[in-house]
């Protein structure tokens, strides 16, 4: 019995060493392409484009994919999709967003935004470069891909629900799992963090109008004062969180502006206010929307006013909650430990920011996770959506290798399951 046990142990050791060698080789190969990836990112950063206007970015992505011998297809207006691998099932998707923000960049460097009032202040230029890097790595290894990797370059994440348009154009056809990553200024460069279950909030924006009756300030009894009514409405709305919601739930109701009136001696006819509603469950957001409508209309009526609430749909569509699949979350952590090392994988945190990656997750299991970019030496310390936001570009080859490993190892595991006859489900 000793000899077979020894051989088994030797096989395990060789297999483990071989796996480690492959992962080190992947990271080295990604690092060899660092200059190209960083160059792509800088070209995108210098020419930022807002949601559904990513024409230059989209053309750049298509050109780079075609140079790799991949067939790029236009979707969702300015989106791009390409497949690499066998062209057969199983199919796993990797997603990057491409749009910029209406922010004036205040970072002085050679590749500063050349577009006045527009900036890549959320790292989508980095996401695009990382996925293009993965496209190159995968295309070099396509003979060993046991299935198909679908690359999704998505427009309009910033409020435009671009993911929903990608879905309408069929990018998820045949896909059984999807992964996405987002740069995170809170973690050191190259550290990843994932969280299973509800991870990011369902989000919507609302506008409310309180209509009264204008009149001179010295005759309040002849007027219907919408200011008083709006004051009571806004205070009452805060009780929806403190008195109606389970304290263990995560919800946000913010009033972010109030406007109305332009004279000092008259009651205005109308007060308008608005803000955002957020919940870590999509169902919770629907409940909150319903109660906001009831409170605004009811409190306004108490004060002889008319209250109207509009949930914004067109320019700011509602986003569902991001819900990370538990098995795929485990896959991300396992791959992260193997590729980057155990010390580079941390528990993720729930946040109340929205992310339209959630639209994909409504149809297929998926995971959205963070990858750190914090590096004080290069000034990569600012929060996203900040005009001083800056990225440690060392993250780009790491992210490209991670995308590649996530897809490859997922498909390899699926092929192993098929060989032993086991069933795969999420």
UniProtKB/Swiss-Prot annotation:
Gene3D superfamilies named in the record: 3.30.70.360, Zn peptidases (3.40.630.10)
Family matches, as InterPro entries: Amidohydrolase (IPR017439), Bact_exopeptidase_dim_dom (IPR036264), ILR1-like_Hyd (IPR044757), Peptidase_M20 (IPR002933), Peptidase_M20_dimer (IPR011650)
One annotated GO molecular function: hydrolase activity
Gene Ontology BP annotations: auxin metabolic process
Signal peptide bounds: 1-19
Keywords, in A-Z order: Hydrolase, Signal
Top-rank EC class of the record's enzyme: hydrolase
Domain of life: Eukaryota
EC identifiers of the protein: 3.5.1.-
Similarity comment: family membership: Belongs to the peptidase M20 family.
General function of this protein: Hydrolyzes certain amino acid conjugates of the plant growth regulator indole-3-acetic acid (IAA).
NCBIfam families (alphabetical): amidohydrolases
Protein name per UniProt: IAA-amino acid hydrolase ILR1-like 5
Gene behind the chain: ILL5
């Amino acid at each position: 019995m000793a000899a077979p046990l020894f051989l088994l142990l030797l096989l395990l050791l060789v297999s483990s060493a071989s796996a480690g060698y492959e992962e080190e080789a992947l990271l080295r190969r990604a690092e060899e392409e660092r200059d190209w990836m960083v160059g792509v990112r800088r070209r995108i950063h210098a020419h930022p484009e807002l949601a559904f206007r990513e024409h230059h970015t989209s053309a750049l992505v298509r050109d780079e994919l075609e140079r790799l011998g991949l067939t790029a297809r236009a979707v969702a207006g300015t989106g791009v999709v390409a497949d690499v691998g066998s062209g057969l099932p199983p199919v796993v998707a990797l997603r990057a967003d491409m749009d910029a923000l209406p922010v004036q960049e205040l970072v002085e460097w050679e590749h500063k935004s050349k577009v006045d009032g527009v900036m890549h202040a959320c790292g989508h230029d980095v996401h695009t470069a990382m996925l293009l890097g993965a496209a190159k790595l995968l295309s070099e290894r396509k003979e060993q891909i046991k299935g198909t990797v679908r690359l999704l370059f998505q427009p309009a994440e910033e409020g435009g629900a671009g993911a929903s348009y990608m879905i309408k154009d069929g990018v998820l056809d045949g896909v059984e799992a999807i992964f996405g990553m987002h740069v995170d200024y809170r973690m050191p460069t190259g550290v990843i963090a994932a969280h299973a279950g509800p991870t990011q909030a369902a989000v919507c924006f609302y506008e409310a109008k309180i209509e009264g009756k204008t009149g001179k300030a010295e005759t309040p009894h002849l007027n219907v004062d919408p200011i008083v009514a709006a004051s009571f409405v806004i205070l009452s709305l805060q009780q929806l969180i403190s008195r109606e919601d389970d304290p263990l739930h995560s919800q946000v109701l913010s009033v972010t502006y109030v406007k109305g009136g332009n004279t000092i001696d008259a009651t205005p006819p109308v007060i308008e206010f608005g803000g955002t509603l957020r919940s870590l469950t999509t169902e919770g957001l629907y409940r909150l929307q319903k109660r906001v409508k009831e409170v605004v209309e009811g409190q306004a009526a108490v004060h002889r006013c008319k209250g109207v609430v509009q949930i914004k749909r067109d320019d700011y569509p509602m986003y569902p909650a991001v819900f990370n699949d538990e098995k795929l979350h485990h896959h991300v952590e396992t791959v992260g430990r193997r590729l980057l090392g155990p010390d580079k994988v941390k528990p993720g945190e729930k946040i109340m920011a929205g992310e339209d990656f959630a639209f994909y997750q409504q149809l297929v299991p998926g995971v959205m996770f963070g990858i750190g970019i914090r590096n004080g030496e290069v000034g990569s310390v600012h929060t996203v959506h900040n005009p001083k936001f800056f990225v440690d570009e060392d993250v780009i080859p790491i992210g490209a290798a991670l995308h590649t490993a996530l897809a490859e190892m997922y498909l390899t595991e699926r092929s192993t399951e098929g060989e032993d006859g086991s069933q795969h489900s999420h």
